[in-house]
């Protein structure tokens, strides 16, 4: 089941690159940078996985009201309950791209790489 939750996505390797660029760029002094490559719903991640051969990815997007009811029986879902269905304010990484010359990987590329690594480790089949 794909729960209705959205979050900012960035590859940890891109975060590391941004840190290095910030240390090397004088214009970054005193600045803060949002590094989310984009915001994704869990159902979007499931679709990316499904489209790339990961057949066990969630197939059903659960409505908010169903997820909230299920939260009464699932501790992790209960913790996520306040965030279900909420659209995040879209944080842009434009500042990091402009000042640092930061070029993040696409979220699709990162998701597929992560899934392949998890598969290679034998954690999914």
Describe the residue ranges of each PLM region.
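Residue-level signal for the nucleotide or nucleotide-sugar donor/cofactor binding architecture
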Residues: 10-13, 40, 105
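Mid/C-terminal beta-alpha module of Rossmann-like enzyme folds, strongest
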Residues: 18-78, 107-125
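Conserved C-terminal active-site "lid" loop/helix of NAD(P)H-dependent oxidoreductases
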Residues: 71-101
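Short, flexible active-site loop motifs that bind/organize anionic cofactors or intermediates
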Residues: 5, 35, 57, 86, ...
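A conserved pocket-lining segment of Rossmann-fold NAD(P)-dependent short-chain dehydrogenase/reductase
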Residues: 1-10, 14
